[in-house]
């Protein structure tokens, strides 16, 4: 239900047509769904690297408060991607 409200706000602020506002809102929803799925796959694995004497390690490190400067043409999509 909030999707339409967010889409309308994007349309007003970014001077877009409503279908573009809805598309951008759906894009952020899809990004959040994808990130939620990725969080379930974080096991703290240690893997070999292609670089000699290096290893890859999955570590969960919350960032805390984050600021984001977004482009005018895709304000919500850029913000959503920054959250992930």
Question: Predicted regions: what is each one?
Answer:
Residues 45-84:
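Conserved small-residue-rich beta-alpha loop and adjacent elements
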């Amino acid at each position: 239900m909030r999707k339409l409200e967010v889409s309308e706000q994007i349309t007003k602020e970014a001077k877009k047509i409503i279908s573009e506002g809805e598309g951008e809102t759906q894009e952020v929803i899809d990004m959040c769904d994808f990130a939620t799925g990725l969080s379930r796959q974080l096991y703290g694995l240690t893997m070999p690297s292609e670089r000699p004497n290096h290893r890859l390690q999955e570590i969960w490190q919350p960032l805390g408060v984050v600021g984001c400067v977004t482009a005018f043409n895709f304000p919500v999509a850029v913000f959503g991607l920054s959250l992930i």
